C-alpha cells in the first residue's frame, strides 16, 4: 500500500509540474519561471530511489535537528550583524533566501525533530534532549524570521496530534505536548527582541484598518485585498483560471482603475497558495494541488495507524506533518 502511495504521490507531483510548465508556456515565461516545475520533476527519481533503498529512520531526525540548528545559527548570524534593527523589530532573518520560506522550513524541521520523541533508543534521555534542541532551534529560527503565517500549520499539527492522543487515551504524551507548546509560546512572548506582543497588536490594528477604512498599504491589509482580488478572478474563470500572465494583466488593469491599492503592484502572488492556484489555474489546478496534499497524507496516515513499532510510528508521523505543514503554510 505504501508503494502505491509513492506512485500516486509521484503522479500528483508530475501533474503539478506539468500544470506549471503549461502555465509558463501560455504566459510566455522562460528562465527562472521554470525553476519550480523543474525542482518538482527532479524529486521524482529521488522518491523512487528512497522507496527502494530507504535510509535508517534515525538519520531523518539527525538531519532535522542539524538542519534546525543550522537555521538558528544563520538567523543569529544575520541578527548579530544588525542589532539596531533587531531592537526595533525591523530585522527578519531570511537565510539568504526569503524570510517567509526560511521561517517555514525552520518550523517544519522543528516539528519533525519532535516527532522522533518515542523512537526507541538505548540512551533515551540523551536522545530526547537532542530532539528538544532541534525543536527549540527551529522555533527560535522561525521567530527570528518574523514569519507569522506559517504558525497556522503548527496550530493545525498540534491540534491533530492532541486529538489523536486523546482518542488513543495517551494522557502522558498529551500533557507533555501541551506543556511544551505552552511554555514555548509563553517563553517567546517574554523575549523583547522578538517583539511578539507588538506584532500581534500591529496585526489586529491592520485588520481593523482594512475592514473600517480599506487600508491595503500594510502587510495584513495587502494580503486581505490580494485574497479578495484573487477570489474574484477565480469566480470569473473557475475552470482553468487566468494563467500567470492573465493574472498580472488583470492586476495591472485593476491598478489603473484604482480598484486595488498601488502597494499591490510589487506582488505577483496573492500570498495564499490555494487562491493563487485558483485564480491562475482554476479548479483543475486546485484539484492537482489538493492531490499533492492529500495523497501523501493518506499514504503516511494508513501506515501510521497500522504501525506497531514506536520508531516506525514516529517515522510515519514525521511524514504526516509535511503535507499538513505545507497546507498550513499556504
Language-model region placement:
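Membrane-embedded alpha-helical segments of multi-pass membrane proteins
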Residues: 1, 34-46, 101-110, 152-159, ...
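Transmembrane signal-anchor hairpin modules in multi-pass inner-membrane enzymes, especially those
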Residues: 1-28, 42, 52-58, 62, ...
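A membrane-periplasm/extracellular boundary helix in multi-pass inner-membrane enzymes
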Residues: 144, 165-214, 228-236, 244
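Transmembrane alpha-helix segments characteristic
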Residues: 5-20, 65, 69, 130-140, ...
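Alpha-helical transmembrane segments of multi-pass inner-membrane proteins
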Residues: 56-87, 97-167, 186-191, 298-301, ...
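Membrane-interface helix caps and helix-loop-helix hairpins in membrane proteins
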Residues: 25-33, 141-148, 330
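Hydrophobic transmembrane alpha-helices and their immediate junctions
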Residues: 163, 281-324
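Long extracytoplasmic/lumenal interhelical loops at the membrane interface
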Residues: 85, 214-228, 236, 240-281, ...
Amino acid at each position: 500500500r505504501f508503494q502505491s502511495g509513492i506512485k500516486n504521490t509521484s503522479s500528483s507531483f508530475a501533474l503539478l509540474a506539468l500544470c506549471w510548465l503549461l502555465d509558463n508556456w501560455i504566459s510566455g515565461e522562460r528562465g527562472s519561471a521554470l525553476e519550480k516545475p523543474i525542482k518538482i520533476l527532479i524529486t521524482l527519481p529521488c522518491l523512487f530511489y528512497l522507496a527502494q533503498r530507504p535510509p535508517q529512520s534515525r538519520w531523518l531526525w539527525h538531519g532535522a535537528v542539524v538542519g534546525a540548528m543550522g537555521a538558528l545559527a544563520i538567523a543569529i548570524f544575520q541578527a548579530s550583524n544588525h542589532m539596531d534593527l533587531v531592537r526595533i523589530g525591523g530585522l527578519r532573518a531570511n537565510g539568504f533566501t526569503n524570510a517567509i520560506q526560511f521561517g517555514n522550513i525552520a518550523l517544519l524541521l522543528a516539528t519533525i525533530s519532535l516527532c522522533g520523541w518515542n523512537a526507541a533508543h538505548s540512551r533515551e534521555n540523551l536522545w530526547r534532549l537532542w530532539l528538544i534542541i532541534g525543536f527549540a532551534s527551529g522555533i527560535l529560527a522561525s521567530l527570528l524570521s518574523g514569519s507569522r503565517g506559517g504558525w497556522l500549520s503548527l496550530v493545525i499539527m498540534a491540534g491533530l496530534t492532541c486529538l489523536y492522543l486523546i482518542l488513543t487515551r495517551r494522557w502522558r504524551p498529551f500533557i507533555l505536548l501541551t506543556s511544551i507548546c505552552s511554555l514555548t509560546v509563553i517563553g517567546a512572548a517574554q523575549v523583547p527582541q522578538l517583539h511578539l506582543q507588538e506584532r500581534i497588536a500591529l496585526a489586529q490594528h491592520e485588520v481593523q484598518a482594512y475592514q473600517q477604512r480599506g487600508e491595503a498599504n500594510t502587510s495584513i491589509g495587502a494580503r486581505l485585498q490580494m485574497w479578495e482580488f484573487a477570489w474574484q478572478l477565480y469566480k470569473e474563470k473557475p475552470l482553468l483560471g487566468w494563467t500567470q500572465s492573465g493574472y498580472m494583466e488583470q492586476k495591472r488593469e485593476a491598478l489603473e482603475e484604482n480598484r486595488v491599492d498601488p502597494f499591490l503592484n510589487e506582488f505577483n502572488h496573492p500570498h495564499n497558495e490555494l487562491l493563487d492556484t485558483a485564480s491562475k489555474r482554476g479548479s483543475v489546478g486546485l484539484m492537482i494541488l489538493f492531490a499533492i496534499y492529500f495523497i501523501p497524507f493518506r499514504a503516511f496516515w494508513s501506515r501510521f495507524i497500522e504501525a506497531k513499532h514506536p520508531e516506525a510510528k514516529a517515522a510515519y508521523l514525521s511524514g504526516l506533518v509535511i503535507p499538513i505543514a505545507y497546507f498550513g503554510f499556504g
